[in-house]
Amino acid sequence: MKVQEGLFVVAVFYLAYTQLVKGQPRKECQTRCGNVAVEYPFGTSPGCYYPGDESFNLTCNEQEKLFFGNMPVINMSLSGQLRVRLVRSRVCYDSQGKQTDYIAQRTTLGNFTLSELNRFTVVGCNSYAFLRTSGVEKYSTGCISICDSATTKNGSCSGEGCCQIPVPRGYSFVRVKPHSFHNHPTVHLFNPCTYAFLVEDGMFDFHALEDLNNLRNVTTFPVVLDWSIGDKTCKQVEYRGVCGGNSTCFDSTGGTGYNCKCLEGFEGNPYLPNGCQDINECISSRHNCSEHSTCENTKGSFNCNCPSGYRKDSLNSCTRKVRPEYFRWTQIFLGTTIGFSVIMLGISCLQQKIKHRKNTELRQKFFEQNGGGMLIQRVSGAGPSNVDVKIFTEKGMKEATNGYHESRILGQGGQGTVYKGILPDNSIVAIKKARLGNRSQVEQFINEVLVLSQINHRNVVKVLGCCLETEVPLLVYEFINSGTLFDHLHGSLYDSSLTWEHRLRIATEVAGSLAYLHSSASIPIIHRDIKTANILLDKNLTAKVADFGASRLIPMDKEQLTTIVQGTLGYLDPEYYNTGLLNEKSDVYSFGVVLMELLSGQKALCFERPHCPKNLVSCFASATKNNRFHEIIDGQVMNEDNQREIQEAARIAAECTRLMGEERPRMKEVAAELEALRVKTTKYKWSDQYRETGEIEHLLGVQILSAQGETSSSIGYDSIRNVTTLDIEAGR
């Protein structure tokens, strides 16, 4: 309970201090001392002056005299000036030249500084004095006054009987020391002393006869001091300063800190929260409205309203309106102008309408050219099926990609550009914009969209729909944001924590997806470009097969097709390359290369491998033949517990990459073997008839097809030349 009471007291004091810092003195604070007004940030008691600086604490004595330190206060200005009276300095001598009196002024101004409105003045004959000041830096100056009679010219302080020089601003310590050249013996009768003092410019008028004798018995002179709040600039304090409402902050010209002033049209104390009040110019004769106009006060300003029959001119005066004849011509001119503007506006609206109609017709034209009617007909005629193809609009695609902005590009290849798209429901998709190709490919494209949209496999990238209202069709599919298997094995996302268990699971998932495409899809699909760069991984490292731009649909009554060779070097089936005959065993070969990459951690085609062929398949076979199998396996995956599993996986990879397609297993057999290997239950083994030396020789005999590294040579759909190809890729 005591802790809570203590916290409450602290909070109350904090709020009180915050209000005080923001310029809220207590209501009972003294506002006058004698005939001098005391205005915040000045005050005469705690809680009444600005708490950040004791220099604002003034003293009002019992005689109602206001003091700044020991200096009487004349008045204060909220614009940053304080006028005080400062004692003069003097040194006096008798007729024999002996010093009889010496007063040297030494004054500290606290955080206030001298204003440049002051003048350093010396009065006397054969006299001189020094002014020494300090602040941010030190400053010294002096003044000399020479004369030999009291007939010196009055009103002039040019060095004859009186010397006066400017004083720089910004100094908070003042020391004045008067001196004499010869101690005044020759001028003692009319000038026994040297006087030196600071005085506000224009507040001292030299009279030779009186001033040389005794300075008219004046002992103090008005001096102007500059004051400001704190030691920071307006920019540094931002909104934490003390300036109230309807005021503005400006940096002090007399030193550090800042001052406040009311905005134009307001007056009052800018250091109080509501100190600046609106000036009613209409009752204070501060307006310039003419005799025919009526003044209307507004916040911070005023308006001059003209009576009926008058108008306001450029001089803010009210003059009679123009004659009816001239006004009639003005009306004609305005009517013509307005009519012309309406006609131009109508023409502009008509042009916009025509443009909109043309755009609509163009989108419809593209929709028909890209097979929109065919797609709608086939989807509507599919009956109860799992065909779910969403047709997106051209406007929706443009908004999703921010106008196909380059910052949304995920990747570019030979078959088109992939953009990251954000749909209205904030779901993220990948949008493939193909390169312009042959319009005769439309039926093949529509067929591919229909087939791929029916694929519902967790390890195959899902096609969501397409857009046919653009010059080239767009394909929309799910977005995978964790990179490709290639990136994790060799590239920017290389992950040393990609364990054997991860790699075996990825291989099993890819094999399962390919087996599904080959054997379980409504129409068998051969991917034709299986590689680590086309296998995407999500945040859980789940594999997703992507990029169906090179895929082929295999009719149910055929086992293979004759096609133009297409694929990626290092993964390309040698038999397919040599014969042009495409079947599901081509995907098996490519998968075998991927499995070797998972085992070895090496690229499918590398020209920097020492003591080993550049092709990974040949390198794998060579290492196996020469009993260097352990050297080619990635050291991060092999340990004493998994050597047998890795050897089994290597055997599967070797069987998948046999030279002759008929000797390779089918993908569903590969998937079953890997699944069995993964769960360590039953292992299905294939025939050993191809594991002899002859197979190794065949593998070693595979020629490297090109020296272009991992460049993909994509020609398009094989049955039609020079056509648009659409990759089904995810974000990469």
Curated annotation (Swiss-Prot):
A family per Pfam: PK_Tyr_Ser-Thr
Signal peptide: 1-23
Boundaries of every Protein kinase domain copy: 404-677
Compartments, as annotated in UniProt: Membrane
Residues annotated as binding ATP: 410-418, 432
Keywords: ATP-binding, Calcium, Disulfide bond, EGF-like domain, Glycoprotein, Kinase, Membrane, Nucleotide-binding, Phosphoprotein, Repeat, Serine/threonine-protein kinase, Signal, Transferase, Transmembrane, Transmembrane helix
Catalytic-site annotation from UniProt: 529
One record GO biological process: response to salicylic acid
Topology class, membrane: Single-pass type I membrane protein
EGF-like domain sequence ranges: 230-277, 278-319
Disulfide bonding pattern of the chain: 234-249, 243-260, 262-276, 282-295, 289-304, 306-318
Tissue: Predominantly expressed in green tissues such as stems and leaves. Detected at organ junctions.
Role description: Serine/threonine-protein kinase that may function as a signaling receptor of extracellular matrix component. Binding to pectin may have significance in the control of cell expansion, morphogenesis and development.
Family: Belongs to the protein kinase superfamily. Ser/Thr protein kinase family.
Protein name according to UniProt: Wall-associated receptor kinase 2
Organism: Arabidopsis thaliana (Mouse-ear cress)
